[in-house]
Amino acid sequence: MNTVKDSKPLALELVEVRKQYGDHTALDGVSLNVPKASIFGLLGPNGAGKTTLIRMVAGITGPDSGSISFFGKSLTSEHINEVGYLPEERGLYKNMRVGEQAMYFARLRGMSKTVARKELLDWFERLEVDGWWNREVSDLSKGMAQKIQFIVAVIHKPKFLILDEPLSGFDPINAARIRKEIIRLRDEHGTTILLSTHDMSSVDELCDHVALINHGRKILDGPVNLLREKARAGKIDLTFRGNLISFTAALGSGAILHSADSKGDNVHEVVLGLPATIPIEKFLKWVTTEVDVLSCSPQSVSMDDVFLRAVKDSTANKIEQS
């Protein structure tokens, strides 16, 4: 599948990247373009190859073939301090104090002691964990520990940030707080964010672009709004009062009736497919001669819908090819 090109400069470019572990192909010719200062969703079922791709970008492993460019240069270990990484498998040293451990990680990233302490205290206050600086890590709740690890991932102001399931385990209030910070990092600091998640509501809210990987291959790629529009494919939701048979007869040969649900009192909710050659205004003129249209709007398509359809189609194609 071709990579979607974007007019914005690229933060990350993968070209035909492959990775094999024994007989298992983790990535099979994956190409991606991640625009600068964007939130790019990396999606896929468990075992699809997302973690392998993330580990490559984080510098933990390398591809067997293909290339990875980081802000226009070949990705090397020299770029490690320009990347922030929040792994799905969290881990803090339980026998250290919270502030001591945060300082340790900040210093590893090359920050001076003075700057690290100032930046950390600002973040601790922002995420409302400032009262925990001198507490033991073992005293932290799961949510508190996740906040600390988020801070550690972003403290050195990386220009590229990898977030693997960053909202997992948060209550709704703190999940909203972290989402707000992710958006702020993009908008105020120009941070490019690679977001790996199964939470499609977060994808809807946060992501500018997404790529979907399944069985080690990219099966979907593009701006979120365009993928939703493509998945909608001219479908509209319509509610009317009248005779369903008369309504169906009034559709003509162009429109397609996908589903119909009778609600009682002669009211029906239907999903229709209209080709681009039939404007919705023209269509409504046809049907209003037969029924009373109560509401009509383009069908709402979420990224959850897009994800499920793409994975289903990909799996069906794989079965056909096997």
Q: Predicted segments — roles?
A:
Residues N2-L10:
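Primarily ABC-family ATPase nucleotide-binding module
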Residues N2-T3, P275-S322:
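C-terminal coupling/interaction segments
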Residues P9-L12, K19-N214, L220:
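ABC transporter nucleotide-binding domains
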Residues K36, G131, G242, L274-A276, ...:
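Non-catalytic surface loops within mature trypsin-like serine protease
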Residues K73, K218, R241, L274-T277, ...:
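Short, surface-exposed acidic/glycine-rich loop or hinge patches that mediate macromolecular interfaces
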Residues H79, A231, V311:
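Short, flexible helix/strand-to-coil boundary loops that buttress conserved ligand/catalytic motifs
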Residues K180-L274:
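ABC transporter nucleotide-binding domain
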